Each structure stands twice: as structure tokens, then as C-alpha cells.
Amino acid sequence: MKFNDVYNKHQKIIHYLLKKYNISYNYDEYYQLLLIKMWQLSQIYKPSSKQSLSSFLFTRLNFYLIDLFRQQNQLKDVILCENNSPTLTEQPTYFNEHDLRLQDIFKLLNQRERLWLKLYLEGYKQFEIAEIMSLSLSTIKLIKMSVKRKCQHNFN
């Protein structure tokens, strides 16, 4: 079977999958990748198999799209370019996802909570943090609960 025939008959599978996963931002890129994969799958499909071509394509394309999502999640680095730069000749700044989340968290916290979180992330125990901050252990526990509550409220 020629690929044009396969494409004309089964192109709706690609649109369905992209709609199923609410892909709107990089629609064309995902469409192109799925189209290439559809061509590859049409080359290896055996009509003598028990599975129809449409179910074969749907299953394989669905799993391929999921694999693409997983690959994208493994790319944790984000490039942030300066807004005031008219050209992209400047060196971009790299932040990983954890740094960006920490920045968001730090914006929510007051000074004491930020200091507690910084010390906690550096590996200090609660009693050590209490000594460094010159606060009681019960106050440190209250700060910890406050940070936890703010994070859960804003990020869950």
C-alpha cells in the first residue's frame, strides 16, 4: 500500500492523538514527528497480522507520542534570554527546573522562612537551625509548618 493512501485514510489518528493530549503549543512539530513515524510504521506493517492497520497505527503512534513526552521531561534545562537584548548574540542563562521552582518558592516566603529553607536544604538539622537562627526549637517547627503549608497551597 502506498503511503499516500495510508495517509489519506489514517491521518485523523494523528489529529485525534494531538487533541487527546491537548497539544496546541507545538502542534506542527508533533504532527510532523507523528507523520514520519506513521510512514515508518506503514513500512513495517504486515497485512497478514491479526491487528488492523488502523489499530496498529493508533497503538504505536500513541506510545510514540508518550515517549516524546517522556524525552521532553528529561530535558530539564530552560534557556532564559534577557528581554532587553535585541539580538540573541549574548550568552543565554541556564537554569534547571529545580532552581526555577526554588525561586518561585522563595518569593512566597518571608525572611525567616527563606533562611530556614536555605539552611534546611544545606542539610542542617532542626536543632542546628535553631542555634544558627537563635530561635527555640518549637519556633523552628512552626516555621517549617508554615513553609510546608505555603508550598502545598501554591504548588499542589
UniProtKB/Swiss-Prot annotation:
The protein, known as: RNA polymerase sigma factor SigS
Protein family membership: Belongs to the sigma-70 factor family.
Keywords, in A-Z order: DNA-binding, Sigma factor, Transcription, Transcription regulation
Knockout mutant characteristics: Cells lacking this gene display a decrease in viability during heat shock, long term survival and starvation experiments. They also exhibit significantly reduced virulence in a murine model of septic arthritis infection and decreased capacity to colonize host tissues.
NCBIfam families on file: sigma70-ECF (TIGR02937)
Keyword set includes Transcription regulation: yes
DNA-binding region, residue range(s): 126-145
Purpose of the protein: Sigma factors are initiation factors that promote the attachment of RNA polymerase to specific initiation sites and are then released. Sigma-S contributes to the protection against external stress, thus playing a role in cellular fitness and survival.
Gene Ontology molecular-function annotations: DNA binding; sigma factor activity
InterPro entries listed in its UniProt record: RNA_pol_sigma-70_dom (IPR014284), RNA_pol_sigma70_r2 (IPR007627), RNA_pol_sigma_r2 (IPR013325), Sig_transdc_resp-reg_C-effctor (IPR016032), WH-like_DNA-bd_sf (IPR036388)
Keyword hit for Transmembrane: no
Pfam families in the record: Sigma70_r2
Conditions for induction: Autoregulated.
GO biological process, one term: DNA-templated transcription initiation
Parts forming coiled coils: none
Chain ranges for the short sequence motif Polymerase core binding as given in the UniProt record: 29-44
